[in-house]
Amino acid sequence: MQSVQGTDAMTAPAASLPGSKKVFIKWALLGTVGLINGYATILMYSRGEVAFAMLTVILTALALYVFGSKKTYAHRYIYPGIAGMILFILFPLAYTVGLAFTNYSAKNQLSLDRAQSVLLDRTFQSGESYPFTLYKTDSGHRIVIKDGDVLLSTPEFVLGSAISDLDLSPVDTVSGTAEPIKTIVSNRTALSSIDLHFANGDDIRMSGLRKFAGVVPLYTMQADGETLKNNQTGELLKPNMDVGFYQAMDEAGNFVGNTVSPGFVVQIGTDNFERVWKDDGIKEPFISIFIWTVVFSILTVLLTLMIGLVLASVVQWEELKGRAIYRVLLILPYAVPAFISILIFKGLFNQSFGEINMVLNALFGISPSWFSDPIMAKSMVLIVNTWLGFPYMMILCMGLLKAIPEDLYEASAIDGANFVQNFTRVTLPLMIKPLTPLLIASFAFNFNNFVMIQLLTQGGPNMIGTSEPAGYTDLLVSYTYRIAFEGGGGQDFGLASAIATLIFLLVGALALLNLRFTKLSQN
């Protein structure tokens, strides 16, 4: 009995060892993940990316809790999906909505502190300039400037070291080899950080690739910590929190004159949304593009459904020979990547050399302006998008037609129903319910079909007299892209975010209406 107990006691630690290893490995991995993400969070926060730092903290803390606690064991399987939804849907959505209430643009990207430091680093030439030559010596380099007929040289120094101050002294001759301009260009940063001192106390700094000059700061920070004094003109500048720029002030304390770049990001409330409705140069194209977006989405869904349903009915016809070949040929447009098909059609519709215009000109003597006429451009977009979308609808309809019992058609034939009555009273009612969610999804996809517009027409032909770039074939999503990245007056991310927020609300409202309508029709 004692020997049995002794054996159990000896085998107990060995049995528990694998479990201990698993626990150790688990916490080692979790600790490593926590340390890496913690370090990344510190880096992001130190660089001013507070939103991304907070996102990293939330996802990391959630991961450590889910994978470290036994209570949340079941949630480990859904955490990747939840994390992906937060990372790729909720965070971009919240970030975009947040930008919509700021003046964030190509001109206003920095924080106030960063804009101040950029302005304080600016200098202007306040005195005489002196040509210089960089000489390479046996133990380093020396800078030689020419003051009239006098040569002044610095002591030898190591280029690229931490030296920032050098004294000038007269020399009769210069030893060493003059460096070429490419050496000065490659070491411009190091040379620009060196101050040269004359014997009388004057200082000069590098002001060009061949000159040193007396350089002083253009702006000086005042005692209040935010006012800048222009040392060249004497005017005072303060940050204008309404526009996000430093601007001069008059004696009464009012902002006057032009703003000084770079700008900084400020909260401007609903100004971007008000611009959409109050600025006719934005409102009119926005309304026009919104109407076209809805029409484009609806017509695309209807045309692809009609063509797909007709072709599905044809290839399902048992008396048709070679049905398998026809199915393969009709599905091919769906198998070819969309961007390749779009670029091919762009060449086919070329107004001067495209095959489509060549055929139309040979048969009817016409050459439509597919890319310069708004109506023809919209027609071309619908034609190409229908070509890309009908195979998908055909595949869906083929499956749904197979699911309809043949007994229903036999019963309708006994009642004397013709083909049209079979379609409207048997086929369509049985197909429309399972098709409705897919049609809604197709509508939502085409509502934001950016790739189609960008590759085929790039939104053109352009509208005339608009404040922001807009085209007749632009969808709301491509219109937003052009405002954000192709604006003639600079990239306006705040306005683009406001329009993107409106698009989100519009698509959400349309989706709710469609779902309500679907539920009512089913009831």
From Swiss-Prot:
GO biological process terms held by the UniProt record: maltodextrin transmembrane transport
- Gene3D superfamilies in alphabetical order: D-maltodextrin-binding protein, MBP, MalF N-terminal region-like, MetI-like
Matching InterPro entries: MalF_N, MalF_N_TM, MalF_P2, MalF_P2_sf, MetI-like, MetI-like_sf
| Entries under Pfam families matching the protein | BPD_transp_1, MalF_N_TM, MalF_P2
| GO annotations of cellular component type | maltose transport complex
Q: Which residues form the ABC transmembrane type-1 domain?
A: 290-514
The membrane-topology field of this record reads: Multi-pass membrane protein
PROSITE patterns linked to this entry: ABC_TM1
Q: Write out the transmembrane intervals.
A: 23-45, 50-69, 82-104, 289-311, 323-345, 379-401, 435-457, 493-515
**Regions of this protein lying in the Cytoplasmic compartment:** 1-22, 70-81, 312-322, 402-434, 516-523
Record bears the keyword Transmembrane helix? yes
Query: Which residue spans belong to the Periplasmic compartment?
Result: 46-49, 105-288, 346-378, 458-492
GO MF annotation terms = ABC-type maltose transporter activity
Q: Sorted alphabetically, which keywords does the UniProt record give?
A: Cell inner membrane, Cell membrane, Membrane, Sugar transport, Transmembrane, Transmembrane helix, Transport
Q: Where in the cell is it found?
A: Cell inner membrane
The annotated subunit structure for this chain is: The complex is composed of two ATP-binding proteins (MalK), two transmembrane proteins (MalG and MalF) and a solute-binding protein (MalE).
Q: Hey, which family's this protein in?
A: Belongs to the binding-protein-dependent transport system permease family. MalFG subfamily.
Q: What task does this protein carry out?
A: Part of the ABC transporter complex MalEFGK involved in maltose/maltodextrin import. Probably responsible for the translocation of the substrate across the membrane.
What name goes with this protein?
Maltose/maltodextrin transport system permease protein MalF
What is the species listed in this Swiss-Prot or TrEMBL entry? Vibrio vulnificus (strain YJ016)
Q: State the gene name recorded for this protein.
A: malF
